[in-house]
């Protein structure tokens, strides 16, 4: 598990199996919420997550695989695609320069 201060987060990847539907929708939503903080939010299949990423968010069922593919990166899992508190936690940490662990 890694940790990062929200003020250091400049790139977030929303990862899913295919990197198309659900992750694209979530990336668009997070982009809107984080636009005033100059944070880039993109989507990707788990197997293609780029090295240059500060934080990865993925469904909890993909968290172990994501951590094994990108060791040392902060991985924040979520359960629900809509309304999960993990998204609000990340947004608040970026806004408040708080630590994010995952």
Predicted regions mapped to residue ranges:
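Conserved active-site segments centered on acidic
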Residues: 2-46
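Structural signal for conserved beta-strand scaffold positions within catalytic alpha/beta enzyme cores
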Residues: 43, 58, 76-77
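Short, polar loop motifs at secondary-structure junctions
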Residues: 44-47, 60-66
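Alpha-helix C-terminal capping/helix-to-coil transition sites in glycosyltransferase folds
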Residues: 51-52
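Short, Asp-centered acidic motifs that coordinate Mg2+ and/or phosphate
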Residues: 55
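Glycine-rich nucleotide/cofactor/substrate-binding loop typically near the N-terminus or early
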Residues: 59-60, 82
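A short helix->loop->beta-strand "cap" motif at the edges of active sites that frequently abuts
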Residues: 70-73
């Amino acid at each position: 598990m890694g940790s990062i201060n929200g003020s250091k987060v400049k790139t977030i990847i929303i990862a899913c199996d295919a990197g198309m539907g659900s992750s694209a929708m979530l990336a668009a939503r997070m982009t809107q919420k984080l636009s005033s903080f100059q944070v880039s939010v993109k989507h990707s299949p788990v197997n293609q997550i780029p090295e240059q990423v500060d934080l990865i968010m993925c469904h909890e069922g993909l968290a172990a695989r994501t951590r094994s593919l990108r060791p040392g990166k902060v991985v924040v899992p979520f359960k629900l695609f809509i309304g999960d508190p993990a998204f609000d936690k990340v947004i608040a940490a970026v806004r408040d320069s708080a630590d994010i662990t995952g």
